[in-house]
Amino acid sequence: MFGKGGMGNLMKQAQMMQEKMAKMQEEIARMEVTGESGAGLVKVTMTGTHNVRKVEIDPSLLEDDKELLEDLVAAACNDAARRVEENQKTKMAEVTGGMQLPPGMKMPF
């Protein structure tokens, strides 16, 4: 069915892919991105595992209304999360050689 050495090669490829995935997961966990809102007045730094590391708020916003500040912090968090997702997709494409996964399917499985 797999031919001479076909199954062995397939297993080797699967193992190499698994090793690349583990390395990619470690890189993503160490990665940090910064999301911004209000033209950089609010910045949120987040890890590749979506943990917020730091929130920076321009002092001028502390004098404005509370609701505006809350909206800007939420927007910066969402921007950081979007950037994490983009970086994860880029890393995944490096590992899978650009192979597209079906919609909704996330790796590692």
Swiss-Prot record:
GO terms for cellular component: bacterial nucleoid; cytosol
SUPFAM superfamilies with a match to the protein in the record: YbaB-like
Pfam families (UniProt xref): YbaB_DNA_bd
Gene3D superfamilies assigned: Nucleoid-associated protein YbaB-like domain
Cytoplasm as UniProt keyword: yes
Keyword Cytoplasm among record annotations: yes
Keywords of the record: Cytoplasm, DNA-binding
Major localization listed first in the record, in broad terms: cytoplasm
Intracellular or extracellular location(s): Cytoplasm, Nucleoid
Domain of life where this protein originates: Bacteria
GO molecular function annotation: DNA binding
Self-association state and partner proteins as the record states: Homodimer.
PANTHER family: NUCLEOID-ASSOCIATED PROTEIN YBAB (PTHR33449:SF1)
Family: Belongs to the YbaB/EbfC family.
HAMAP family recorded: DNA_YbaB_EbfC
Primary role: Binds to DNA and alters its conformation. May be involved in regulation of gene expression, nucleoid organization and DNA protection.
Name of the protein in its database record: Nucleoid-associated protein Sama_1311
Organism per entry: Shewanella amazonensis (strain ATCC BAA-1098 / SB2B)
